[in-house]
Design a protein with these regions (language model features):
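Zinc-dependent metalloendopeptidases
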Residues: 1-134
Length: 134
């Protein structure tokens, strides 16, 4: 997984120093329960971003490869398969138009109202899609 998440604005609520650290923890959680497959992490990757580039890009963006975000969409996973259904790529894009942090426990409210989006919780969910779940 090519982590290209950039820096956080200081220490996150869970004590993590970066989005990459949180994403690596989420991937490690998946790895701890799998025996026939493992996620491999490339932190701060410089791989080109793009659907169809055979790299599993993980990044924040204001669009989904140029398309606007649907209302209230936190993140998307875009999977590409070959004609036999074999997965070739799974990109995870987080909506950077929203407020993010990383924390444990119940959902929290953001200072501007609404829910403070928990990056770790959403990353765990999206990485499940990379595996083909849901």
């Amino acid at each position: 997984m090519h982590l290209q998440l950039g820096a956080s604005n200081g220490t996150l609520l869970d004590g993590s120093e970066s989005w990459g650290e949180v994403a690596e923890g989420a991937l490690a959680s998946w790895n701890s329960g799998m025996t026939n497959m493992r996620f491999t992490v490339i932190r701060d990757s410089t791989s080109a971003l793009g659907y169809g580039n055979s790299a599993n890009n993980v990044f924040f963006s204001s669009t989904v490869y140029g398309e606007g975000w649907a209302s209230r969409t936190l993140a998307v996973t875009l999977s590409r398969t070959n004609s036999n259904g074999v997965r070739l790529e799974g990109d995870v894009i987080f909506n950077n138009n929203l407020s993010w942090n990383s924390y444990r426990g119940p959902l929290r409210s953001s200072t501007g109202g609404g829910t403070l989006n928990d990056f770790r919780r959403v990353a765990l969910h999206e990485f499940g899609h990379v595996l083909g779940l849901g």
